[in-house]
Amino acid sequence: MGDREEIARFYDRGSDLMRELLEALAAAPEQLRTFPEVEDILAWPRRRIASVVGGVWHLRMTEFGGRRPYRFMDEDRSASGRWEIWVDTIQADAIRGAQGD
């Protein structure tokens, strides 16, 4: 997902936890981090990211054609050997803009 308006709409439609996750990712664009690293930053229990991301599946599929305003790298391709998550600079700018709306 790269359209600013679409990202802002996703931000608005997501849960408080999804917004918190997006804000944390937008604070460090282009920085790939494992789920536990992000969960530590947010002081979340383990596996919360999986729950939050899974919780917006229906929203993503029905309103956004499956697109998401964040990126994944699976464990087979990541340097850490674990799933990693991040946002690019365009996504981060759109998320920060949506925070102010």
Task: For the regions a language model picked out, list residue spans one by one.
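Short, Lys/Arg-enriched N-terminal segment that forms or immediately precedes the first helix
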Residues: 1-12
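Short helix-coil-helix linker/hinge
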Residues: 12-20
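Short helix-capping/hinge SLiMs at alpha-helix to coil transitions
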Residues: 26-31
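A short acidic, leucine-rich amphipathic alpha-helix
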Residues: 34-40
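Short amphipathic alpha-helical interaction segments
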Residues: 45-67
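Phospho-regulated, low-complexity intrinsically disordered regions of nuclear gene-regulatory
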Residues: 72-101
